[in-house]
């Protein structure tokens, strides 16, 4: 067996690393948000600002739109404004299940991309290549994970 057949290619490693990082961030968000009461999950401790629940809706919508809908052709139709203004939020089990499903969609879509597809332009030109867009989406998730951590401290008054 040649060395190349027993080692991951750079493309495989990049795809794996992106998905693993996103899954770790998702797990961190769940760890922060799951212990909260519904009131804490949906309260807005900073005005103007977002609730933790609304940020989770936003992360879910972002992944479903840019990765699921645009790259995976899932047919997802985004309502970004609703992500931040939902007045009748979903039950917590549904909120977390939808986040899990969005991250699973990313894994499925990314696993199916070839090197040529990763290097191709993303449907939204502002992102550059598909690979660069995927890096952006992971960074975006990380940014909001940090905000969620801060909001948990505020709602828990820690």
What is each residue range found by the language model?
Residues 25-32, 102:
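Amphipathic alpha-helical packing segments from all-alpha helical-bundle domains
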Residues 4-5, 15, 19-23, 30, ...:
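Short, contiguous alpha-helical
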Residues 12-19, 89-93:
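Active-site rim elements
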Residues 27, 79-81, 89, 108:
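Positively charged, low-complexity intrinsically disordered regions
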Residues 86-121, 132-141:
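Acidic/histidine-rich alpha-helical segments that form the ligand environment
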């Amino acid at each position: 067996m040649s060395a190349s057949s027993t080692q991951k290619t750079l493309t495989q490693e990049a795809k794996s690393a992106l998905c693993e990082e996103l899954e770790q961030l998702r797990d961190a968000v769940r760890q922060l948000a799951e212990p909260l009461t519904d009131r804490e999950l949906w309260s807005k401790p900073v005005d103007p600002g977002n609730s933790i629940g609304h940020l989770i809706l936003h992360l879910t919508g972002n992944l479903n739109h840019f990765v699921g809908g645009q790259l995976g052709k899932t047919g997802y139709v985004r309502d970004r404004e609703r992500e931040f203004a939902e007045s009748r939020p979903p039950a917590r089990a549904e909120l977390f299940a939808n986040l899990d499903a969005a991250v699973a969609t990313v894994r499925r879509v990314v696993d199916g991309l070839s090197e040529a597809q990763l290097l191709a332009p993303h449907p939204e030109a502002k992102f550059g290549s598909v690979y660069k867009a995927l890096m952006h989406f992971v960074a975006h998730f990380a940014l909001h994970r940090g905000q969620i951590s801060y909001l948990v401290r505020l709602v828990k008054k820690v």
